[in-house]
Amino acid sequence: MRKMMPMNPKQLKKLMKQLDMRQLEGVKEVIIKMEDREIIIKEPIVTVIKAMGEKMYQIAGGSEEEKAIINISEEDIKLVMEQAGVDYETAKKALEETGGDLAEAILRLTDSGVE
């Protein structure tokens, strides 16, 4: 196994300038959206590299979370609102928590006494 020679910060800064690289500061999270799910990377280190007129983003570190995307229609939200007697946001949240299951969302809202 070959060991890498440690690079001093001054050399690293010079190399980054030559490659037109810079680190983005203050990035809290990066979300990669796919058709059926999202990958959420919290507290990442994001580096922007410019090469041949294109920007490339390198994302490293941070904690990763993956969650499925649930498509909830306006009609479903309105139905839950009417049946459970709740506002829009409460109905939407209940549908998200139940994976879009109308009956389960209505039952949770009516059983918990939310008005």
Curated annotation (Swiss-Prot):
Record function comment: Contacts the emerging nascent chain on the ribosome.
Family (UniProt): Belongs to the NAC-alpha family.
UniProt-listed GO biological process terms: protein transport
Signal peptide (UniProt feature, chain positions): none
Gene Ontology MF, one: RNA binding
Entries under InterPro entries matching the protein: NAC-like_UBA, NAC_A/B_dom_sf, NAC_arc, Nas_poly-pep-assoc_cplx_dom, UBA-like_sf
UniProt protein name: Nascent polypeptide-associated complex protein
Positions in coiled-coil regions: none
NCBIfam families: archaeal-type nascent polypeptide-associated complex protein
Subunit structure: Homodimer. Interacts with the ribosome. Binds ribosomal RNA.
Keywords, alphabetical: Protein transport, RNA-binding, Transport
Keyword Ribosomal protein in annotation: no
Gene designation: nac
